[in-house]
């Protein structure tokens, strides 16, 4: 155990107040020669750490699982999940929660080591992770944070000095993940499947205290909990859709109760606008396609509601009715969030009857002409209509006149409208081919400069800076079709 705490560790372990069926205490498995390859300075500071101390050998040993900081209580969390519609009892198969860091402002964040070795939930896996997927999670999660989308974050990546065997031999790595918590829809499914109402109540009470303390005194706090999670997910999924983010594996174990995006395995950002876009190699039926994400979120939340039925009301029929009523509200909340976001993307302050039609017409044209999602809105924001099939079409020219006329009707000036668009239309996203370039350089050549440059650009997606323009360039035909694999 590390005694020197100049690094700023301030760990608590409230999760162990839950019944022991929710976790297994287990130490991380040491690795041979850990090396720090990436540290998130700004995140470290916000968590109360001293970044310079975290670069020292004793702290790198903690990120590698070779040592534990003061106050650590390593454990693997148990949960269940519907994976592509099929229910399984799961758990942290290659991750350990080492504790909850209490920040200088009193906030609580899980500190989890991902790739830290086998656990009782590993299901024949080796408990390890490869460098490429861990760096990928770092890049995408930090890009999501900069886009103002609730997300888990990445504090550090260390290489282990040991190979990891997948289809081929790959360099091993461990990611330090930071989250408001790792409580998932699947955690509630796990509690419900075990059949103990006391355990289910314990989990619900703990979750309310940790994430939604304002509803503790609510006359039916478990209904209120369901309402809060639905509200958070309706907002989150709308934010995904508005930037063209495709999660790829929206299983119930990847839906957080806090409303943060988690698990960046087969995710990617859409290039051409297409409702049917799928990147994940294992999603052969398009279950988690871009256009399906709102529906799948509702499906996942229905599984949460099912799990809560034993504590929603003492009468089962009444509990079922409460669950159904609350789930039915998701689609309206999602639509409202999405519509408000789309209005901002088009600079619309006021509300007009034609707004829905204006938005739908644009999206239909974008799909028809295979227009790039991000760059179309970027061009509209800059009012630079480029030489593309969409912009040269008669339909678009007609639409553009209607849109300009709509902007002129507003009390707010066009300058204000374009300024709002700038704040809601990212100039750059983590383009799939640029992420792969960065990973190739880092993993194959040990050159992290490409990744650092990409991260620097992605940190300010709404800056519209000229030095970001290289990241707006579309992939060449050889970079398509892009496929992702569940490596994280």
From Swiss-Prot:
Listed InterPro entries: SelO
Co-factor requirement: Mg(2+); Mn(2+)
Stated name of the protein: Protein nucleotidyltransferase YdiU
Classification via PANTHER family: PROTEIN ADENYLYLTRANSFERASE SELO, MITOCHONDRIAL
Known EC number: 2.7.7.-, 2.7.7.108
Binding site for ATP: 91, 93-94, 114, 126-127, 177, 184, 263
Gene that encodes it: ydiU
Major enzyme class: transferase
Record: active site: 253 (proton acceptor)
HAMAP family in the record: YdiU_SelO (MF_00692)
Residues reported to bind Mg(2+): 254, 263
Pfam family, one: SelO
Keyword annotations of the record: ATP-binding, Magnesium, Manganese, Metal-binding, Nucleotide-binding, Nucleotidyltransferase, Transferase
GO molecular function: AMPylase activity; ATP binding; magnesium ion binding
Record's function text: Nucleotidyltransferase involved in the post-translational modification of proteins. It can catalyze the addition of adenosine monophosphate (AMP) or uridine monophosphate (UMP) to a protein, resulting in modifications known as AMPylation and UMPylation.
Swiss-Prot/TrEMBL catalytic activity: L-seryl-[protein] + ATP = 3-O-(5'-adenylyl)-L-seryl-[protein] + diphosphate; L-threonyl-[protein] + ATP = 3-O-(5'-adenylyl)-L-threonyl-[protein] + diphosphate; L-tyrosyl-[protein] + ATP = O-(5'-adenylyl)-L-tyrosyl-[protein] + diphosphate; L-histidyl-[protein] + UTP = N(tele)-(5'-uridylyl)-L-histidyl-[protein] + diphosphate
Family: Belongs to the SELO family.
């Amino acid at each position: 155990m590390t005694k020197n705490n100049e690094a700023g560790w301030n760990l608590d372990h409230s999760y162990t107040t839950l019944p022991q069926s929710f976790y297994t205490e287990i130490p991380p498995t040491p690795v041979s020669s850990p090396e720090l390859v990436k540290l998130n300075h700004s995140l470290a500071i916000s968590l109360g750490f001293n970044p310079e101390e975290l670069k020292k050998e004793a702290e790198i040993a903690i990120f590698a699982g070779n040592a534990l900081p003061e106050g650590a209580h390593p454990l693997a969390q148990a949960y269940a999940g519907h994976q592509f519609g099929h229910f399984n009892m799961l758990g942290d198969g290659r991750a350990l929660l080492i504790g909850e860091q209490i920040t200088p402002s009193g906030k609580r964040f899980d500190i989890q080591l991902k790739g830290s070795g086998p656990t009782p939930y590993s299901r024949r896996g080796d408990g390890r992770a490869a460098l490429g997927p861990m760096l990928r999670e770092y890049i995408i999660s930090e890009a999501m944070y900069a886009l103002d989308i609730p997300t888990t974050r990445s504090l550090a990546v260390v290489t282990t000095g040991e190979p990891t065997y997948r289809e081929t031999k790959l360099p091993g790595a461990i990611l330090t993940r930071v989250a408001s918590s790792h409580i998932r829809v699947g955690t509630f499914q796990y509690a419900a499947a075990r059949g103990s109402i006391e355990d289910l109540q314990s989990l619900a009470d703990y979750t309310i205290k940790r994430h939604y303390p304002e509803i503790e005194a609510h006359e039916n706090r478990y209904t209120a909990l369901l309402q809060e999670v639905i509200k958070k997910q309706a907002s989150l999924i709308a934010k995904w859709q508005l930037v063209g983010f495709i999660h790829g594996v929206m299983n119930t174990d990847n839906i957080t109760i806090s409303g943060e995006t988690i698990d960046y395995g087969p995710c990617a950002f859409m290039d051409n606008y297409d409702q049917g876009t799928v990147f994940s190699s294992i999603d052969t039926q398009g279950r988690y396609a871009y256009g399906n994400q709102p529906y799948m979120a509702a499906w996942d939340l229905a599984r949460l509601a099912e799990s809560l039925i034993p504590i929603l009301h003492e009468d089962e029929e009444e509990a079922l009715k409460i669950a159904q009523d609350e789930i039915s509200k998701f689609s309206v909340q999602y639509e409202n969030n999405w519509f408000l976001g789309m209005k901002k993307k088009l600079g619309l302050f006021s509300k007009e009857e034609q707004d829905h039609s204006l938005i739908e017409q644009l999206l239909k044209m974008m799909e028809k002409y295979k227009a790039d999602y991000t760059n179309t809105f970027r061009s509209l924001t800059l009012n630079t209509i480029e030489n593309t099939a969409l912009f040269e079409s008669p339909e678009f020219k007609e639409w553009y006149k209607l849109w300009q006329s709509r902007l002129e009707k507003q009390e707010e000036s066009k300058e204000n409208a374009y300024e709002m668009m700038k704040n809601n239309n990212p100039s750059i996203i983590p383009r799939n081919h640029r992420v792969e370039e960065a990973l190739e350089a880092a993993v194959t050549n040990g050159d992290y400069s490409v990744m650092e440059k990409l991260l620097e650009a992605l940190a300010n997606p709404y800056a519209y800076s000229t030095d970001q323009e290289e990241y707006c360039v579309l992939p060449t035909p050889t970079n398509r079709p892009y496929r992702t694999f569940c490596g994280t």
